[in-house]
């Protein structure tokens, strides 16, 4: 059955037109769903009984089931179950009046980065648009209890957003548009490992969302060791596509850089990064490595973390040191799901 959360308003208008209904009914339906969070069409009381019944028969209104919520200070992590029994996770980070939701886009991930728990799973499947939107509905329902709203969305959970392009783009429209979640494009960030052709495609979508690129190394030799796809999409070409995106959208690009001890946190790595980004519309997020048992990498020493940051800052690079709020409750990429499956006796 078609899940209504996969549809944009124009598509619903067309369907309703075919049913002989006026187009404003679509606005009423979306108002119930996205503003009042009503997911039972029978409760949409300003619609005729016939239309309510028809909606019930034609569409599914299902959202993912919450299996477990873990919380630690500012971070809440939701382990969700999809209709086919697969698990995904969504993270809510509440900080300084902001409620940022980190959504997943795939069950597992095909990229296989050598520092990521999700990379160990491999790709099981892409999420449908409604499964991405459903994650936001679950969290908005939870936030509603304290009369708060989602303010920011980051595509930074399980999976590579640009490897599930069509569903991700559609979900961004639903999140962004007034008839949907009505969250402005500057509050939406898509984080990618760097699938170059899709970055160019994204630049042409006129979405003007923020783009973050997981760089994690300042030369191809190092980057290819932890991000296999770098062999196909090397750093120079990746940066070219990123700066094209910046030029097209007027938004500087964020480069995520996970600092790993004695691997990419040395003085020469910082200097090399400066050479790549100096004078460019770029911002660097430094993230000290969040240890995953399955990988040998160690967390950088504090003095090396601060030295790295200082070299960038002193060279005029915009840089932020980000402490991962999720790390204490295993909110890093894919870790809660991995733990859950382990407890269920499944292998990942
Ligand atoms: S870091 Fe991102 S792209 Fe790489 S394996 Fe993990 S989820 Fe996939």
From Swiss-Prot:
What lineage does UniProt assign to this protein's organism?
Bacteria, Pseudomonadati, Dictyoglomota, Dictyoglomia, Dictyoglomales
Details of cofactor binding:
Binds 1 [4Fe-4S] cluster. The cluster is coordinated with 3 cysteines and an exchangeable S-adenosyl-L-methionine.
The record's EC number reads 2.1.1.192
Positions that bind [4Fe-4S] cluster: 109, 113, 116
Q: List the disulfide bonds.
A: 102-333
The positions annotated for binding S-adenosyl-L-methionine are 159-160, 191, 214-216, 290
Instruction: Quote the PANTHER family the UniProt record gives.
Output: 23S RRNA METHYLTRANSFERASE, RADICAL SAM CORE DOMAIN-CONTAINING PROTEIN
Show the catalytic activity.
adenosine(2503) in 23S rRNA + 2 reduced [2Fe-2S]-[ferredoxin] + 2 S-adenosyl-L-methionine = 2-methyladenosine(2503) in 23S rRNA + 5'-deoxyadenosine + L-methionine + 2 oxidized [2Fe-2S]-[ferredoxin] + S-adenosyl-L-homocysteine; adenosine(37) in tRNA + 2 reduced [2Fe-2S]-[ferredoxin] + 2 S-adenosyl-L-methionine = 2-methyladenosine(37) in tRNA + 5'-deoxyadenosine + L-methionine + 2 oxidized [2Fe-2S]-[ferredoxin] + S-adenosyl-L-homocysteine
Its annotated function is as follows:
Specifically methylates position 2 of adenine 2503 in 23S rRNA and position 2 of adenine 37 in tRNAs.
Q: Which gene encodes it?
A: rlmN
Q: Identify the keywords attached in UniProt to this record, alphabetized.
A: 4Fe-4S, Cytoplasm, Disulfide bond, Iron, Iron-sulfur, Metal-binding, Methyltransferase, rRNA processing, S-adenosyl-L-methionine, Transferase, tRNA processing
The record's annotation in InterPro entries points to: Aldolase_TIM, Methyltransferase_A, RlmN_N, RNA_MTrfase_RlmN, rRNA_lsu_MTrfase_RlmN/Cfr, rSAM
Q: So which cofactors does this thing need?
A: [4Fe-4S] cluster
Q: What's the name of the protein?
A: Probable dual-specificity RNA methyltransferase RlmN
């Amino acid at each position: 059955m078609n899940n209504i959360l996969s549809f944009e308003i124009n598509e619903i208008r067309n369907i309703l037109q075919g049913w002989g209904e006026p187009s404003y009914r679509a606005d009423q339906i979306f108002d119930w769903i996205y503003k009042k969070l009503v997911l039972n069409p029978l409760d949409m009381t300003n619609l005729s009984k016939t239309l309510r019944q028809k909606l019930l028969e034609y569409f599914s209104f299902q959202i993912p089931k919450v299996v477990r919520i873990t919380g630690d200070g500012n971070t809440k992590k939701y382990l969700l179950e999809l209709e086919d029994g697969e698990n995904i996770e969504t993270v809510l980070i509440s900080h300084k009046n902001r409620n940022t939701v980190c959504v997943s886009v795939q069950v597992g991930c095909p990229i296989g980065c050598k520092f990521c728990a999700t990379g160990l799973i491999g790709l099981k499947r892409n999420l449908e648009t409604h499964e991405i939107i459903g994650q936001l509905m679950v969290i908005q329902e939870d936030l509603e209890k304290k009369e708060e709203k989602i303010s920011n969305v980051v595509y930074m959970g399980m999976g590579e957003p640009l490897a599930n392009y069509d569903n991700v783009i559609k979900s961004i429209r639903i999140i962004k548009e007034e008839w949907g979640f009505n969250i402005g494009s500057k509050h939406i960030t898509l984080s990618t490992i760097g699938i170059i052709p899709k970055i160019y495609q994204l630049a042409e979508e006129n979405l003007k969302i923020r783009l973050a690129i997981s760089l994690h190394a300042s030369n191809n030799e190092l980057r290819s060791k932890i991000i296999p796809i770098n062999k196909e999409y090397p750093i120079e070409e990746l940066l070219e596509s990123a700066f094209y995106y910046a030029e097209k959208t007027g938004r500087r690009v964020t480069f995520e850089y996970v600092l790993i001890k004695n691997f990419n946190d040395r003085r020469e790595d910082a200097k090399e990064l400066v050479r790549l980004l100096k004078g460019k519309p770029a911002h660097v997020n430094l993230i000290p490595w969040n240890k995953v048992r399955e990988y040998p990498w160690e967390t950088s020493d504090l003095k090396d973390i601060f030295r790295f940051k200082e070299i960038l800052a002193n060279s005029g690079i915009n840089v932020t040191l980000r402490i991962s709020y999720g790390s204490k409750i295993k909110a890093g990429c894919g870790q809660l799901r991995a733990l859950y499956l382990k407890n269920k006796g499944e292998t990942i």
